[in-house]
Swiss-Prot record:
This protein's name: Probable lipase C14C8.15
E.C. number(s) listed in UniProt: 3.1.1.-
Entry-linked InterPro entries: AB_hydrolase_fold, AB_hydrolase_lipase
Keyword vocabulary terms for this entry: Glycoprotein, Golgi apparatus, Hydrolase, Lipid degradation, Lipid metabolism, Membrane, Signal-anchor, Transmembrane, Transmembrane helix
Positions annotated as active site in the UniProt record: 214, 382, 408
Compartments reported by the entry: Golgi apparatus; Membrane
Length: 460
């Protein structure tokens, strides 16, 4: 590239970062103005936006069931609306964070251990999400956790530090910047092992399976790669759309942000919670309007069409999708994705980020050390997953399953995922875990032999 070309490229990148700064500043200004408005005036604007939306897009008005799901306050309400009960648990990590944990089971009389008689499965959510993201589907048949509960698995929904259900620390308030001083390393080293240890302590099993989505999947990879005790406790791992190595950046603005120096990202987003504004607008905007804004944002910045997710499903899901995390986690994820290596957090303040520096080599998570059955499920149109790059890093005993025409969010929200994604998850877990176990409990619980054979052969 010529000198003029390099200068032009440099100017474009800096210009795009400047535009990002301006957009963030503009959003902050609107948010502050909205906060200081009197409550009656905010309610008036809310009602007016609802009327305008209803007039121009009446065909997209949500039905009563969707309204109830949209208005659900938490994971407990969402599960109840779908006919399931939920137990709340709390896990204390060794560095002082209190993590909310949700155990899902059928609304039937009897002990949980009798209803959920198969080994436990832990679900790990993605970036800026919480446990609600797994159960905010329009139909219960489209929620992966519910499908596993119906199979008899002991299902647990995790909540990582900083989100809606894990906003406590024994030393620091969430208003203290020290509360938010954690990267993905802290989650991999403290949160996931603590959650797994707790789950195994409250039931009779000595092993567990993991299901992670997006960033949740890469966190599971990281935790398993460095913790021998954790590896010995995990029977199988299903990674849904692990966002380690994006296939491509859909827009120059996103590319410029991801490739920006870490200190510049801190200057843009601060050092506390990441994009708390998303949670704010989610609370003050009419849900269909908020869903439209999110949809436009995802289309513009990430080129996600969302064509496999119905408009009503988007309205419900986007009302529960976002939660808090630290800016440091986002910066860490940006370091991982731009280098396409699952590495530890780079503390170097150097202007030009590099996997190798003059002084040190950033530590990489040795995921090739993981020796357990791993299934990677991803969409063919998912621009957050470069499967060819991932294949070079995946450990033995791994298999990759591609879902045609699926994008990133389709894996957990797609309209057709019941017959595609859920089927794959259930089959993989049944194949790896349930074979020997079904035989061992057949007599103890009086299970019908024909039923057991049907489940194992995937004929029922």
């Amino acid at each position: 590239m010529t000198l003029n070309g390099n200068i032009m490229k440099y100017c474009l990148e800096k210009g795009e970062i400047l535009i990002s700064f301006l957009l963030i500043a503009l959003e902050s200004m609107f948010r502050i103005c909205t906060v200081i408005l009197p409550s009656p005036l905010r309610n008036w604007f809310y009602e007016q936006s609802k009327k305008v939306y209803s007039y121009f897009l009446p065909e997209l008005l949500v039905d009563d069931n969707a309204n109830k799901l949209t208005d659900a306050r938490d994971t407990i309400d969402l599960c109840a609306l779908h006919g399931y009960d939920l137990e709340e648990h709390f896990v204390r990590t060794t560095d002082g964070y209190l993590l909310g944990l949700h155990r899902v089971y059928k609304k039937k009389k009897g002990k949980i251990e009798e209803l959920n008689y198969l080994p436990p499965v832990l679900f790990i959510h993605g970036l800026m999400m919480n446990s609600e993201s797994w159960v905010c589907n329009l139909k219960k048949e489209d929620a992966i956790p519910f499908a596993l509960v119906e199979q008899g698995y002991d299902v647990w929904l995790g909540n990582l530090r900083g989100n809606k259900y894990s906003i406590k620390n024994i030393k620091f308030s969430s208003q203290n910047p020290k509360f938010w001083d954690f990267s993905l390393d802290s989650i991999a080293i403290f949160d996931i092992p603590s959650i797994v240890k707790y789950i195994l302590s409250v039931n009779s099993f000595d092993s567990i399976s993991l299901v992670g989505f997006s960033q949740g999947a890469i966190l599971a990879f990281a935790a398993l790669s460095i913790d021998t005790e954790l590896r010995n406790s995990v029977r199988a791992f299903i990674a849904l759309a692990p966002a380690i190595a994006p296939k491509k950046y859909s827009g120059r603005t996103v590319k410029s942000i991801i490739h920006a120096n870490s200190q510049l990202l801190y200057l843009m987003f601060g050092r506390n919670s990441m994009l708390g504004s998303a949670v704010f607008w989610q609370a003050v905007l009419y849900p269909p309007v908020f869903a439209k804004i999110v949809d436009l944002f995802l289309r513009f910045f990430l080129s996600w069409t969302g064509k496999n997710i119905s408009e009503t499903q988007k309205i419900v899901a986007y009302s529960h999708l976002y939660s808090f995390t630290s800016v440091k986690c986002f910066v860490h994820w940006a370091q991982i994705t731009r280098r396409k290596v699952l590495q530890m957090y780079d503390d170097s303040p150097g202007f030009k980020p590099s996997y190798y520096t003059n002084l040190n080599r950033i530590a990489r998570y040795p995921i090739e050390n993981i020796r357990l059955p791993i299934t990677l499920v991803y969409g063919s149109n998912d621009n957050m997953v470069d499967i060819e790059t991932l294949k070079t890093q995946l450990p033995p005993l791994s298999q990759c399953i591609q879902i045609p025409n699926y994008e990133h969010l389709d894996i957990i929200m797609g309209d057709t995922k019941k017959d595609i994604v859920i089927q794959q998850v259930v089959e993989q877990l049944n194949h790896v875990i349930a074979g020997d176990y079904f035989e061992s409990i057949k007599e103890e619980f009086g299970l019908d032999t024909e039923l057991v054979d049907g489940v194992m052969n995937h004929t029922i």
